Amino acid sequence: MLNSGDILDEKYEVIKILGKGGMGTVYLCKNIILGNFWAIKEVIRNTKNIDILAEANIIKGLNHPGIRRIVNVFYVNNNVYMVQDYVDGQTLKEFVEANGRMQIEKICRITSDLCDIVGYLHNQNPAIIYRDIKPSNIMITTGEKIVLIDFGISKIYKNDAVVDTVCACSNGYAAPEQYGAGKSCTQTDIYGIGMLIYFMLKGRPPFTGIEPLLEENYETYINENLKIVIKKCVKIDIKDRYTSVKALHKEILKILKKDKSQISVQGKVKKTVKGVLGFIGAILAYIYILHWNKKESTVMNTIDRTEIVVPIEVH
């Protein structure tokens, strides 16, 4: 493990650890020559890492604002280091832990952005299967943009493969086929997106893969359309899930549009109610003033009609 102040490749100063996972450790580093910051991933070579450059080889040909670039790769001793764009922000996991469950509109916006990124991966030829969609791999930038990080277990889709050669997944978000019983495909990522939506909706990860499928695990206030989307995403059988991320994205946009319309209507209703209450208040104030003036006039008339008796002293 590297320490703060260590120098890599004669120009990168280690500032701190950004994250640590099964495939390596990511450090925030500063280029001591140019002064800019980078995220550098350290992967230790061992017998498990058959293709230590698999992640770099997948990312190098990609060009999407929601995917970090790899700008350099170098070796130190027995380790490989990948220099990537540094994303200033926080993970979705950190955001939810700090703020709790999210509103429908924000859930849909994050999911929509994620669908755009994952859809881009699936549209590559051959398709790239991300396989590790989870809150800690989703970055929310300071500009409210979504960035997908850590392609450590991503793979190129192979038509001729029957099952995954290596079981690689994150418990709670991985599809059934990732546990060695089948082959990862585009629907594998759709499953992960469904679990991610459930996480944002509940404010906590699912305890089991079955949990989001059961109606009893949803509170009455939860959006019905979003429940339908989640349940379709996380079906056990691949054939029962959405056929593509594009189809899922379309449903999310429908929910977002409907939610915005409801918010707009609610806003108009509140504005109307506020206006009516203001009008009623004005009328009541007017009636009060009339009543007060009438009362005051009555008092004055009484005074005018009252005989004033002045006592006279008799000497």
Please tell me what each predicted stretch does:
Residues 25:
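Conserved N-lobe ATP-binding subsite of Hanks-type protein kinase domains
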Residues 44-61:
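AlphaC helix of the eukaryotic protein kinase fold
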Residues 72-73:
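A short, aromatic-enriched beta-strand patch in the conserved N-lobe beta-sheet
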Residues 77-91, 95:
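Conserved short submotifs of the Hanks-type protein kinase catalytic core
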Residues 110-111:
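Activation segment signature within eukaryotic-like protein kinase domains
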Residues 116-128:
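Protein kinase catalytic-loop region centered on the HRD/HxD motif
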Residues 172-257:
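C-terminal lobe helix-coil module of Hanks-type protein kinase domains
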